Amino acid sequence: MATPQVKDLVLRSPAGSSDVISFAWPLQIGHGQDKHDNGIDIIDTIKFVCDELPSMSSAFEETNLHQIDTACYKTMTGLVDRFNKAVDSIVALEKGTSLPAERLNKFAHPSLLRHILQLVYNAAVLDPDKLNQYEPFSPEVYGETSYELVQQMLKHVTVSKEDTFIDLGSGVGQVVLQMAGSFPLKTCIGIEKADTPARYAERMDVIFRQYMGWFGKRFCEYKLIKGDFLVDEHRENITSSTLVFVNNFAFGPTVDHQLKERFADLRDGARVVSSKSFCPLNFRITDRNLSDIGTIMHVSEIPPLKGSVSWTCKPVSYYLHVIDRTILERYFQRLKTKGGNDHESVGTVRTTRDRAKREANVGQHHHNNHHSNNHANSNNHQRDREQSNGATATAAHQQRHQSQSPANVSGAGIVLAASGQQAASKTRQQLQHQHNQQQRSLDMESSTESDGDATNGNGGNTTTATNTTSASNGPMTRKVWSDWCSSKGKSSQSDDEENNNSNSNGGSNGGSIGGGSVGRQARATTQKKRKKLTRKAAIASKSAAAAQREAEAAAAAAVSVPSKESSSKEDPPRAASAGPGRKGRMKKGARGRKSLKIVGLEALHKQTVLSTSLDTMTKKLPAAPGTVDQQLTALLTENMSHAELDIPTAPQDTPYALQILLDVFRSQYTSMIEHMKSSAYVPQVQKQIAQEQERMARLKNRASQLDKQIKVLIDDSVALLKVRMNELGIHVNSPNDLIAQAKEIVGRHKDLQHTASRMRNEVTFYEGEQKLLLNKQLKNLPEYQKLCGTVNGKVKLEVPPELSETTAQELVLKEIANTLSQRKKLYAQVSTIEQETSVLQKTAEERSTAATLLAQGTNMIVSTGSSSSSSTTVCASAVTAQSNKLNSVKNSRRNREHRARSQEWPEVPEVGKIQESNPEVLAQKIVETCRQIEAGKFQGAGAPSSQVNGKNKAIIEVPPPPATAPVSIKSSPGHHYKDTTLMPAPKQQQQQQMTLSQLPKCELPGLSTSRKQESPKVANFEDRLKSIITTALNEDQEQRSKAVESSPSPSPLHSPAPKRSKQHPAGAINPAQSLPNNLHNIITVSTQGLMHLNANTTISPITPPLPGPGAGATASTAPPPPANLPYGAYGGAVAKTTISGKYQAAKEPKYSPVRQAPLPPPPSHMASLYPAGQQTTPADLGYQRRRSSVSATSYEHYMVQQQQQLQQQQLMLAAAAHAAQRQQMRVEEQQQQQQHQHHHHHHHHHPQHRLPQHVQHQHPHQHHPNEFKAPPADSHLQRSSSREQLIVEPPQTQPLELLPRASSANSDYSGYRIRPPSRPSSNSSQPDYTQVSPAKMALRRHLSQEKLSQHVTPQATPPLPGHGGAPTSGKTIGDLVNGEIERTLEISHQSIINAAVNMSTSGASFMERAFLNERSNDRLLINLNAQRPERVHVRPLSEESQDPQPTSYAQERGPGLGAGGAAAGGNSNLATLAHVAYAQKAQGGARANAGTAPPATHSSSARSGRDYQPVALPRAELKGSIEAYFHEEQQQKQSKGAGSAGSSSLRGPRLNGANPPLEGLAASLQDHVRARKYKEETEERQRRAAAAASSSAGPPAGMELPTHYAHQAPPAHSYHHHGASINGTPHKVELGIKRSSPLAPHQQPPRPSKLAHYEPPTTQQQHAHAHLYANGQVLPPPPAHDATTPSPTPSSSSSSCGRRSNSNNGKLLVDPPLLMSPEINSLLGDERPLQLSHHQQQQQQMLHHHQSQQQQHLQLTQQQLRVAHLGHGLSHGHSTMPTLGGQRNGNGNAADDVNDLATQRTITNYDPRRRLRTTLSGPTKLSAAHSNQNLNGYVMADSSSSCPTIPQ
C-alpha cells in the first residue's frame, strides 16, 4: 500500500533561531537492534525545552507526554503544533527583552547535551551498520565511546579555557562534539582516517551546529578533520594539545609506538586518556629503560565503567597519563647526589621496584616514602650514629624514622626523652633536616613508582605482622633465594625475632610507652626502617643473620658488622647503628629471612634439593595417585594372592579323538621347542630377518623414488603453471588469487561470447537491411532488370545472391554519372536563372527610372482609377472563380498550415541561416545572401516556397503576371518580361512554392515570419536599441530624404510604397502604368521579399539580395516594411515581387508560408494585373508605407516618401484610369487565373476568393514567390489576408474585412502608420525584433552604409509610378534590414497599443480604403516623423484589423489601394508582431503600389511605413514615456479580462470613449468621441489633404514626414490626438506619437494636437471602412469594431487591438484618421499632405469604394459563405466575419468578431492578418485554432502563425 503523503513534523526553535528540527514520517526507522523511534526524540525534546522554559510546561499540562502514541500521525501532529504555538508565543513575548540573553548562549546541561548528541547522531548517521564495515584487527577498527565515559574522564581531569582537546581517531566525532559542548575549551579537534566515519562526521558537524542553534546553546570552537593523525601535518596539533583522547585498544604496537613518539613531545602537564596504557602501572626507571615513555608520565587507571564502549558490554578501563618530566629529572638528580655510592643507588632502585608490593601495607606509607630520604641522608645518619652512643644513636635514628610517620611521633618523643638532652638536640636537628629532605623527595619517590606504590608497605623484608603477607609477595631473586637457604634451619630464631618485632612494632604503632618495650620497639623500628631503606642491605646481611642465629644475640650483633661490610657496602649507616645493638641486627636479619618466606617456597626448595641428591635419583618413589606413572598392575595386584592350581586327574571318559589331538599338539610343541633349542634355529631366524630387512630397504627405496618423482612433477607443474600464468598476465601468490583470476577470465570469456553473438546478430541484421536496400535500389535500375531478367514480365523479387564486384562498381558509377548529369542540369538552370535575374535587374533599373517618371503621373491615376475599376471587375470575376478553386484546395492546406504554424515558430529560411559568430562577418554574409536572393539565386527556391504553404502557392499561381507583363511591356518590354518572370503561371508558381517549401534554405521571411511572429520578444533591448537604431535611422532618414529628394514623388511612395506600388501597379495601374508598376512591383518585390526575409529572419538574409538599384530603391523603401516584415510575410512578398517576377513569385512561396493568407496582396504589384491586387494596393500601400517608414525608422524619409507619394498619388490619380484599366485587364486575367488557383484557395477563403481570388490564389500558391512580387499587398494580405483572405475568399467580403483590417492597418499602418501595430503585435506573434543581436546591429551598420550609397540613386531611379517603389527601392537591403532592426528596436508597448489601435482601425478598412489611400498620404504627411512608440499599437491593430481584410480590401481597392490596402490590411492583421511583419511587407508592397498610385499608394505606403515605424519605437520607452500608453495598457489589461466575456461591449465603450482605465488600445480607441474627433480631424485632414494635394509638390518631404507620422500615429495615434483633445485621445495620441515624444501632446506642445488624418474622401470608403476606422472618423460602422477594438486594446493592445478585436473594422475604427501629433502637425505645417493624402485617398476611396463595393459584395457573398464555413466556426465563437465588418458580416459582425477577439483574442475570423494578430495572445491562438477547425482552415486563430496556418 502506498503510504499517504504526509508532511514532516517540524519543531520550531525556542531560541528564536531560523533553524528547525524536522522529523520525517513515519517516525519509526531502522529495524532490529538499530530500530529507533523518532517520536521519543520529539517528546524528549519537548521535555527538555519545557525544563529550559518553565513557562512552556503549562502548554502541556493536560498532555501526558509519557503516554503519547508516537505511531499516530494525528496525535504527533497535534503535539508538534501545540509545541510550535507555545514556542512562537514565548519567543514573541521575549522579543526585545533581556530574557533570551539570560537563558541563551550558555553551555548545555550534561543531560541536555547528551540528548542533543543523540539527536545529532540519529540524524547524521544514516546507516550505523556501515560503521562496522572495516578490516578486522586493523588500526581502522571502529568503536564508540559512551557519553558517560567521557563525563567520567572529565571528572578525573580538570580543564580550563586554555586547554586544547584532540581526539585521535575521532570516528563520527561525538566525543569532540561532547567536549565542545561541555566546556569553553580553547579548541577541540577530531581526526579520523576511515572514510565512512569521516563522512558521517561531516554531517554530525552540520547538524550539531544546527541543533545547538535550535536550543540556543553555546559550544566552543571545534574541527572534525579527515586524515591520518600520524602524518606530519597533524603532529603540531597533537603536540600542542593539553588533553589527548585516543581509543587505542585495537591500534596495535606499530601505531602505539608512533603515538609514543608524538606523546614524547607533549608539554608537561598534558593529559592523555587511552583505552590501553602506554606504560605499565608499576613502571620504574632503571638504567635499561630510560628511553621509555613511562619515564616521563604518571599512569593511573580510570575506574572501569560498564557499557562505556560500543564493542563490548563489559567494563573497559581507561588510563590517564600525565606528562611529568620531573620524574626523570629526579632520577638523575639522585644518581648525582649519591655520587659513587653505586650500591646505595642500586638499592634505591631495587627498593623503588619493590614498592608496588608494599603498597598494601596501610600503616607503612610514610616508611616507604622515606626510603629515598634515608638513602639521600645516609651520610648524615652515619655521622649521627658516630657522634652519639649506641643507644642514643639508635634511639635518634629510630626517632628520625618515626618522626616521619604521625603514628610514631609519640614514640619518638619518648625515646628522645630517655636518651638525654644532647642526643635529643642532635636528633631534633637531624630529624628536622631529614624530614625536610624527605618532604622534598616525597613526591619524587612516589612519582617514580606507580600510583599503586604510592602507599608503600614495608619492603619485602618487613617483619611487621601487617607486612608478613605482603612480604610473601616479594620478588624471588637469586640473592633472596640464597639468603633464605642459608637461614633455613634457624627458623625458630627467626620466628622469635619476628614475634619480637611484631610486638615492638605493634607497641610503637599502638603508642604504648613501656620502659623495656620502648627500647625494643625503638630498635625494632629502626632496624625495620633501615631494612626498608635498602632492601639490598637487608639481603646482604642475611648471611650474617645466619651466623647471628647460631651465636648469641651479642655474637650475632658482632657478626653483623663484618657481614654487612662484606656483603653489603651500601648500608654503612645501618652497620654503624647496629654496632651497639646486634640483637636488633639479628632481628633485622630474622625479619629479612622471615620476610623472604614465600608461599610454597620451602616445598620448592625441598624439591630442588631432592632432585639434585644422588640417592634420590636412584630411588624411585611410587607414582603419585592418579598420575600417568601409576600402573594398572599396581592397582590390580594389590589384593591378589597367587595359589597353585591342583592338576586335575585325567578324566576317565576323555574321547579318543581328543586324546589324539592333544597328543598331536604336544608333539608339535615339543618339536618346536626342540627346534628352537637347536643351533640352526638362530641362523635361520637371522637369515629371515635379513631377508625382510632387504625387502624393507627395497620398499623404502621405491617409496623414496616415488616421493622424488612426485616432488619433481609438482615442481615442474608449478613452474609450468607460473609460466603460463605469466603468459596470461596473471600474477598471483595463492590458490585463492588464482581461482579469482580464473573466474574473471571465465567471466570475460562469457562476456566476449555474448558480445560476439550480439555482433553476429547485428551483422546478420545489417546484412539483411543491406540486401533489402540493395534490392530496392536495384529494382529501379534497368541494369538490374537486365541482370536478373524478368519472370512473366515481372522483375524478380529476389536480389541476386551476390553482385559481383564489377557489377556493383558499374552500378555505383552509373548512379554517380546520373547524379552528376542531374547536377549539371541544375547548374545549367541556375546559370539560366542568373542570366534571367541579371536581365530582370537591368529591367528593374530601367523600370525604376521609368517608374520614377510614371510614379509622378501615372501611378496616382493607375492606383486610383485602375484600383476601383479593375479591382472591382476583376474581383468579382476572378475572385469568384478563384475563390471556388482556391478555397477548396487551399483551405484544407491552410487549415493544416494554420494549425502547424500556430504551434510552431516560423521556420527561418535556410537562406537566412548563416553560421557566423563574428557579427560583422555575419552582417556581410547576410547582406550578400540577401543580394543573392534579390539577384534571383534563390529563385528556384522561391517557387518551391510556394509549396511551403498553400498561401505561397496562391502567390506562385499568380499567372496574371503575364497580364501584368504585357502592361509592363508597354512601359518597358524588359519590365514586362520581369513582371512575367515575377509572376509565372499559377501552376509554375505552385510548383515553385512546392520547391520553395522543399528548399528551407531559401525560405523567405514570410515563412519564418509566421513562426517568428509567434514569439515576439520585444522586451528588454528597446531602450538601448532605440538609441542605436535612432542614430542609424536618422542616417537612413537622411539618406532616404536625399534619395527622396532625388526622386521626390516616387521615393516617398516607394519607401513605403514599393510594396504597395508593386501591388498597386499590379492591381490598379493601367496597362501603361502596369509596366512601371511591374517594374515597381519587381523592385518592391525584391525589396519586400528582402524585407520579408528581414522580417521573417531577423538575419534578414533576404534583404541583401536586392536585385539592383531599382530593387535597392525598393529595398530602401521596403526596408521599413522588412522591418515590419518580421511580423508578416507581407513585406517579404513585396520584396520578392521586386526581385523578379518569376523568381520572386517562386521565392515568395518560401517566405509566404507565413503570409500565405496575405498572398492576395502580392498581386498588389500584380494588382495592376489583378483586381484583387489592385484593391489591396491602397490599403496595402498605406500599410506598407507606414511599415516602410517605420522600418526605415526615418520619419524624415517617410515624410519625403509621403511627399513623393503625394506627388505620385497625383500622378497616379492621372494614371489611375490607365492603371485601373490595365489592372482591370490584368485583374481579370489574374482573377481568372487566381479564380482558377484561388478556387483551391477559395475553399479556405471564400470571402477572399473573389477579389483576392487571383491575388489570393496567386498568393497561396505563389505567395511565397510573390512575396518578392506581390508581397506588398500579398504580404499584407498574407498576414491579414493570407489568413483572412483565404478565409474570406470572396474578395469583396474578405476585402471588406481585410480592408477594414487593411484600412485599419492602413489607417493604422497607412493613415495611422505612425503606429506600427505589427510591431506591437510582435510580442504576440512576431519574433522579438527588439532583441537585437550584435549581428543584427552590424548588419544594420552595413545596410546603413549601403543605404547611404544606394539610397539616393534607387529612390531617384524609381520615380516611375510602377517604380514608385523604385525610389523606395533606392533603399538597399541595408534599408530593409535596418528597417527590420529598427522595428525590432522600436517595438514598444505603445507600439503594440498603437498596433492594436491600428488593428481596430483596420476594422474600418472598408471605409478607409479610399480613405486610407488619402490617409496614407495624410499619415505620411502627418506621421512621417511620428515616433515609433506607436509601433506597438500598430501591430496589434493590424492584427485585429485582420490581415484577411486588408487582403480582401487591398484586392478590392484596386491596383493602388489594393496594394496599399493589402499592405495596410496586412498591417492591421499584423496587429500581432507577426502581423506587423506581414504588414511591413505589405507596406513595402503598398509603397511600391503607392509609387504606381502615388496618392493612395503613397498614403497607404507611408502609413504602412509609419505604422511600422511606430512599432519600431521601443515599448519600454513608450511605456515609460507615454501616459496614454499606460492608461491604455491598463485599460487593455482590464478590458482583456472583461473583454473576454463581453469584449464587444467593452470594446464599444472603450472606442466610444469610456474612460475605464484606458489600456493601450482602449486609450487609443478610447471613445467614440475620439472617433468623432477623428472624423472631425479626418475631415480637417481631408481638407488639408486637398490643400496638400494642391500643394503636394511643395510639401512632399515635410508633408510626407507628417503624413508618415500620421500614419505612424494611425488610427490609434490620430485617434489619440483626437483623444488628446477629447478624453482618452491624448493617450492614444501619445501612443501614436513617436518614441521621441511619448506624450507628444504634452511633451511636444509645439506639435499641434494630433488630428485625425483621415481625409474627407475617406468618408466614402471610410464609411465603407469608417466603421473599420472607428477610431478614425467612421465610428458608426466600427462601433462594434470600436467596442471590439478597445477590447482588443486591453487584450491585445500590446499584441494588436484591431487584430484582436477581430475587427479590422474595429481596428480601422480604432485606426482613426491619422492624428497628427503636435510634432507632426508642426512638421506638416500646411495641410497639403493631408490634402494630398486626402485627395489620393479620395481617389483611392473612390476606386476602393467602387472596388470595395464590388469586393464587399463579393466578400459579403463570400463572407456569407465563410460565415457558413467560418462564421459557424469563428463567427459563432468570434464573429470572425464581423471582423471584416461591412465586408464580411457588417459592422455588427465585425464588432462580434472584435468582441470574440477581445474575448479570445484569437478570433482572427479567417483573416490571415487577423490570425497574425491573434498570434499575440494565447487565447487568440486557441480561438484561431478553433476557428480554423470551424472555418475549414479559414480561421486565422493563431496570429503569430496565422499566415502559415491559413490553409492553402
Curated annotation (Swiss-Prot):
Expression sites (tissue/organ): Broadly expressed in most tissues. Expressed in a large subset of neurons and in a small subset of glial cells.
Domain DOT1: 19-336
Cross-referenced SUPFAM superfamilies: S-adenosyl-L-methionine-dependent methyltransferases
CC per GO annotation: chromosome, telomeric region; histone methyltransferase complex; nucleus
Molecular function per GO: histone H3K79 dimethyltransferase activity; histone H3K79 methyltransferase activity; histone H3K79 monomethyltransferase activity; histone H3K79 trimethyltransferase activity
Comp. bias regions, Polar residues: 419-428, 1697-1706
Biased composition (Gly residues): 507-518
Positions with biased composition (Low complexity): 391-405, 429-439, 453-474, 1221-1235, 1289-1300, 1532-1545, 1585-1598, 1681-1696
InterPro entries associated with the record: DOT1_dom (IPR025789), DOT1L/grappa (IPR021169), H3-K79_meTrfase (IPR030445), SAM-dependent_MTases_sf (IPR029063)
Binding site for S-adenosyl-L-methionine: 142-145, 165-174, 192, 228-229
Purpose: Histone methyltransferase. Methylates 'Lys-79' of histone H3. Required for Polycomb Group (PcG) and trithorax Group (trxG) maintenance of expression. Also involved in telomeric silencing but do not in centric heterochromatin. Probably participates in pairing sensitivity.
Family: Belongs to the class I-like SAM-binding methyltransferase superfamily. DOT1 family.
Miscellaneous comment in the UniProt entry for this protein: In contrast to other lysine histone methyltransferases, it does not contain a SET domain, suggesting the existence of another mechanism for methylation of lysine residues of histones. Was named 'grappa' because the eyes of mutant flies are of a color similar to that of the Italian spirit.
The protein's name: Histone-lysine N-methyltransferase, H3 lysine-79 specific
Lineage: Eukaryota, Metazoa, Ecdysozoa, Arthropoda, Hexapoda
Gene: gpp
